[in-house]
Every structure is written in structure tokens, then in C-alpha cells.
């Protein structure tokens, strides 16, 4: 067997170094003879192609195009704004025309009913109410007609009793008008004397409740008042639910009903002759919900002066009234406007009564 010669580590390293030395020399020579890369110091290499003037021309062209686009945009906005203003003006004109046309039937109707009353001798007008006072004198009686347009339902209210608030307390129409700050007032429902005072007759609705409870109509008694929507309501009611359905704001009771749905009602015989003629207060409404109040003069309650209910019934129908109700009359009949008593009370002075219808500016 042939023995392998032992080689020391140091001897192996020298041998390896001698073997690669030629290659190291070659690489060193190549590095020395190769020129290193240089950075160019010429700025022209970094200037974009084309001259500065050409570049400026391109930029100017872009700016000009942007200016044209801006002008076109501004012009478009101005045209749109002009069209909007024209459209708004046109719509406004159409609305005014529509409102004018819508109001024409009301104006025509108002002129028609006013023509039957004549020329007003006094007028009150505000954003809540319009009142026109007329004289009436058909020959057999004379008095006043007051036409009322409620622009706001709250412009009409009812007063009950006096400032004392005691049951059965009373006051004159003038006192009620003054105490509540009203511009006008009339007497309202009937009353019954007893227990040291004058108490409202039958069903009376005030301040959201029935004063003495609901009482079904009897002996031709009729309720009359105003609904919360500002419409005159009234008639004979035999159940509370029927009256509640009309949503009353206030109301009082007297007798009789004179007109219903534009037709004359049958006047009870007693009320045709007891008394025959008398000072009267009646209230009615037109189909546009304007109110008409008639207050006739009379020097006493003996039946020789004043108006009959039949005469007033006919007068109201000719005037175009739809529904009408007789209120308390005789010495109770009263009409106050602008701080003065318009009619001449048959008692010689105003009679204190429990209820009044009041009107506010």
C-alpha cells in the first residue's frame, strides 16, 4: 500500500496564493488602464429640447386657451343667472296673476253683497278684521247693518259675566268692549233671572267648556257661535256630540233660527206676535263666511216700534245671507263701535246682560 504524503496547512495556503496571483494582476492592470466615468458640466445637456421662446409660446398658448375657457364659463354663468332672474320674474308674475284671478270671484261677490247694503258710513280695517257699518231704513223700521270679515278667527270672541267672575254677573256691551279692548260689540244670547243674578240661557260654550253643561234644544231654542276655524255655527242640537263635531270656540243660545242654508225657517207663532215689533239683534253669514249683523231701533218693547222677525228674515234673504239667528232683543239690543253706542237702546241706556260678541282689531 502506497502512503499518502502529509501536507501542512501553511504549505497549502502558499500554493493557493501562487495559483491566483496571475489573475489578481490582470484585474489590477485592467482597472488602472480603464478611464473612470465623468459627470458632464455642460448645462446644455440638461435643457429641454427647443428654445426658450418656443417654450414660452407653448405656455402662452395654454394660458390663452385657459382665458378663453374662463370667459366662456363666465358668460355661461351670466346667461344662467339672467335666465334664472327672468324665470323668477315670470313665476312671480304668474303667481300674482293667479292670486289676482283667485281673488276676483271673492271681490265680485263682495261688491255684489255690498251693493245691497249701500255706502258704509264707517269702516274699520286691520290685518285681523274688516268692519263696515251701514244704515238701513226700508220704511217700516230703521237700524244698522254691520258687515264683518274675520281675517283671523281670534278677532271675534265672546265675553261672559263681568270682571267679578261671579255666576250670574252681568255688564253692558260698552263695558265688555272697554274691559276686553275690543273695537266693536253686540249683545249675544238670552238670559234667565234668578238666584240673585242673570244667568245665560241654556247651552253656553265659553273658554273651551260648557258653562252649565250641554242642554238639548227645547222650545225652539237655538245655539249660535263661532267655530275654531272662524265659521258661524248654529241651530238646534239634541246631542252634545252633534255640536262638538262643529268644534265650537264659543257660543250662546236664543230663539229662533231665521235662515238655514239660504231658506226661510218657520218662525214660532209666539215670536211672530210677542212682541210684533221690537228692537232686534240678529247675526248671519254669507257663503264666503263674512258676517252680517242687524240691529234695529225701537223706542219700547210694546210691539209698536222696531222690526218684526218676518221682516228681518225677508231682508236677510234678499241680502244673500245663508244662515241667520235671532239674538236677544228689546232693551238688550245694543251695538257699540269705536267707543260709542251706535243704536238708541229702548231702555234709554244699555242693559247689563251676561253674554256679548266682541270684535278686535
Language model segments and positions:
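Beta-strand-turn-beta hairpins that frame and shape the catalytic cleft
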Residues: 141, 153, 230-231, 285-292
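Short glycine-rich loop/turn motifs
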Residues: 141-145, 220-221, 278-282, 354
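Active-site-adjacent helix-turn-beta-strand microarchitecture at beta-sheet edges
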Residues: 191-270
